[in-house]
Curated annotation (Swiss-Prot):
Belongs to the universal ribosomal protein uS9 family. NCBIfam families: PRK00132.1. SUPFAM superfamilies: Ribosomal protein S5 domain 2-like (SSF54211). Signal peptide: none annotated. One of its GO terms (molecular function) is structural constituent of ribosome. GO terms for biological process: translation. This is Small ribosomal subunit protein uS9. It comes from Syntrophobacter fumaroxidans (strain DSM 10017 / MPOB). GO terms for cellular component: cytosolic small ribosomal subunit. It comes from the Bacteria. Keywords: Ribonucleoprotein, Ribosomal protein.
């Protein structure tokens, strides 16, 4: 077991993240770019680091991510979900702490479709009485 890697997929909205973990220096690579190059918002970086900080593996595992679809927030959520599931592969004892934090649950909220006869999913067209 010279090169042991732990794989998992994470999803959020329309984003899908494929995550690989391996013991290392703690570098995070997203779509062949560093996290600083790929993600602008500090809150998104914090979301991605949450499972690593919570389990005490921050700086001990190299994270490689391939993420497709969605926007910035959806991709960050998908990466967090994927990292959490990969951490379970790495160490099943993390299940309790990750489950309590809600990182293992797939957030099923997606955009509601627009309905015909309406301006958007719920909003009606503007009504003029006269």
């Amino acid at each position: 077991m010279a090169d042991q890697r732990f794989y998992a997929t994470g999803k959020r909205k329309t984003a899908v993240a494929r995550v690989w973990l391996k013991p290392g220096s703690g570098s995070v690579t997203i779509n062949k770019r560093t996290i600083e190059e790929y993600i602008d918002r500090e809150t998104s970086k914090m979301v991605i680091y949450q499972p690593l900080v919570l389990t005490g593996t921050f700086g001990k595992l190299d994270v490689t991510v391939n993420v497709l679809g969605g926007g910035g927030s959806g991709q960050a959520g998908a990466i967090r979900h994927g990292i959490s599931k990969a951490l379970l592969e790495f160490n099943p004892e993390f299940r309790e702490v990750l489950k309590r934090a809600g990182f293992l649950t797939r957030d099923s909220r997606v955009k509601e479709r627009k309905k015909y006869g309406r301006r958007s999913a719920r909003a009606r067209f503007q009504y003029s009485k006269r």
